[in-house]
Amino acid sequence: MDELLEKLLNDLKKKEPKACSIICIGEDLDIIQCMNEHGCFSGGSYSELSNDCETVNFRGIAYKCFFTKDQVKVNFWQISHLTGGLFNFLVSQALNEHGLDLLWIIMVVAQTLSALVSFPEKLLNILRNMKTILINTEETVRNRFEESQNKKLVALLDKNSTTLDISSGILLNFTVVLKQLKHALGLHTSVDNSQEFILQFLRTTLLSVPTSSIVSISADPTSWNNLNVLMKYNFMFQKFKPRDFHAQTIQSETMFIPPCWDTISKIQSVNHEFNIALFKQTAKNFYDTLDISLLLGLFDKSISMLNCHSSKISDGDIPYKSHQVFLQELQNKYSEIKTYSSNKLNKSSIKSSLWKDLIQ
């Protein structure tokens, strides 16, 4: 390995998270309290909410700030409705404070008929905002590269970040939480039919978002365990690292994830170790997977059919990518990245080809 890249890698390994952010989208403003009551923030790696934590609540936007027992700052944003401008602001805040790799977006959906029917449109709007903001973020980062190309490579590291926030910014941690309400159970079959459609829609849509997940929670305290696991995985608190995460740690009856979770972990690990060298390649590949334009027509059709109580849409109407195909694509990308990073780069190639690839 080139001496400069090796030094960069060693510096990255020494860094520990100093801050992270959670953006919770939904009208359930008590979600943070529920997460705390069910052990997501207490015990183990987390401390309970401090009494002196900062609290702001204004017109559907709530902000709380607290610290883990390891003094990791946690910014918690709760918003009832996400707009493009607000999302841009929150992403900018995360980028400036700790990097996009330590940002976790949670969308909470109550399992009621009205919420489930309006959910697909809200989800697609969020994904559209995510894609737009990420593209703008990439342009900003690329401009920073152009401005800094005469400086040392290590100087590009954000002093408050665990990574360079370049390739890892493409992989936003995104989770949809389906919250089961006691009074909504067993009322009528319309809710059950909508739930079935939503799961089908979610599984298909989130195949295009590599680091996405679906979690179902209820009054049962054990149903919150998966959120706890996800938080450890996303933020890598203490000794919990991606390499320690396996699909077996997930309860299959309460959580559904796109395939190749372990492969995604490997891709993220490589990106963290070779952020600069792999920026352009990974950015291009993962932006391609976040293309949801084909789903927009599906949304209009599916909602119309739900409102008219028509038959469910068929599998053939959904632009679906099989797990096997998705797995093979991810494995191919990982192989390309591994091969790329394994090439022996000398100092001259760093100065010439690397910068040339990054800024073109």
Curated annotation (Swiss-Prot):
It is found in: Cytoplasm, Cytoskeleton. GO terms for molecular function: dynein heavy chain binding. It comes from the Eukaryota. GO terms for cellular component: cell cortex; cortical microtubule cytoskeleton; cortical microtubule plus-end; cytoplasm; cytoplasmic dynein complex; cytosol; meiotic spindle pole body; microtubule cytoskeleton. The N-terminal part is acetylated. Its main location: cytoplasm. Keywords: Acetylation, Cell cycle, Cytoplasm, Cytoskeleton, Dynein, Meiosis, Microtubule, Motor protein. One of its GO terms (biological process) is nuclear migration involved in conjugation with cellular fusion. The dynein complex consists of at least two heavy chains and a number of intermediate and light chains. Interacts with rga3, sec10, sec16, syp1, rvb2, spbc19c7.04c, spbc2f12.05 and spac3a11.10c. Belongs to the dynein light intermediate chain DYN3 family. Component of the cytoplasmic dynein which acts as a motor for the intracellular retrograde motility of vesicles and organelles along microtubules. Promotes oscillatory nuclear movement and efficient pairing of homologous centromeres during meiotic prophase. This is Dynein intermediate light chain dil1. The lineage of its organism: Eukaryota, Fungi, Dikarya, Ascomycota, Taphrinomycotina. The gene is dil1.
